[in-house]
């Protein structure tokens, strides 16, 4: 009976996917159909509702929507642009600096927002036109953006470790966050090495005027609030001041305060 139920579940799931039903609805529908077929209809519906409620009844998983909201606030508040300016300031006229800026921006933005897709969209949306203006190969620009987008899923703070902790039965979130630093930074560094070698080979060097001390200080000052968020979240979790879920709420409040203090930068999220 278990084998038959598994077969029905798989067939219904892929059949719904073939008709372009969203994955989440396909999972729910396939599970519900399987339960109804192998249990009484009333009991199957009851079990489905109970499992859905208990499945999301997790204080730890509550951090995920908060980190998603934090990512939306970052995408719509000019924070991505400030991180890009800081990365460009540091990298300067290094060969392949625009692609390296894209990679560094994805790492910083993705770690704060917890979303590789949000990082690729926000950072890539700003960097792609700049790279095109400097004569970068479009395929190379897209590859640098896509390859570095998931880096933020390893560099803390990131919601993926929180989900893993909840699914694995309570692995220490603090330990996971600290363990993500080395592979995340190594991934970003290797991507930047490839961008440097490719940029040097093809002569991808940006031309810009000499930066004044005022511009340098302003760029650093604008990026400090965004970078300080990492210090608040990681420091708060490791010091025990708040849990990862509470840290996600603090991130939302902190970003909201940044937007309130600079209302001209804030774009309403529809």
What kind of region is each of these model predictions?
Residues 64, 96-110, 134-151, 176, ...:
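Alpha-helical transmembrane segments of multi-pass membrane proteins
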Residues 258-270:
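Single conserved hydrophobic/aromatic residue that forms the stacking wall/gate
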């Amino acid at each position: 009976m278990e084998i038959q139920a598994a077969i029905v579940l798989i067939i219904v799931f892929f059949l719904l996917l073939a008709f372009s039903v969203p994955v989440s609805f396909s999972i729910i529908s396939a599970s519900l159909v399987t339960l109804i077929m192998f249990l009484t209809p009333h009991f199957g519906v009851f079990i489905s509702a109970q499992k859905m409620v208990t499945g999301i009844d997790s204080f730890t998983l509550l951090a995920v929507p908060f980190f998603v909201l934090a990512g939306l606030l970052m995408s719509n508040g000019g924070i991505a642009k400030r991180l890009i300016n800081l990365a460009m300031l540091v990298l300067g006229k290094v060969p392949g600096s625009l692609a390296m800026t894209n990679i560094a921006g994805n790492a910083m933005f993705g770690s704060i927002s917890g979303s590789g897709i949000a990082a690729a969209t926000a950072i890539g949306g700003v960097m792609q036109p700049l790279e095109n203006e400097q004569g970068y190969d479009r395929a190379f620009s897209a590859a640098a953006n896509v390859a570095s987008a998931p880096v933020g899923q390893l560099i803390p703070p990131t919601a993926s470790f929180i989900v893993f902790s909840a699914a694995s039965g309570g692995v220490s979130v603090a330990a996971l966050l600290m363990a993500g630093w080395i592979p995340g930074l190594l991934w970003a560094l290797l991507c930047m090495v490839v961008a440097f070698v490719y940029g040097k080979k093809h002569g991808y060097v940006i031309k810009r005027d000499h930066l004044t001390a005022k511009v340098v200080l302003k760029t650093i000052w604008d990026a400090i609030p965004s970078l300080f968020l990492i210090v608040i979240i990681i420091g708060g979790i490791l010091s025990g001041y708040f849990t990862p879920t509470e840290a996600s709420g603090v991130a939302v409040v902190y970003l909201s305060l940044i937007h309130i203090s600079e209302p001209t930068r804030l774009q309403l999220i529809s």
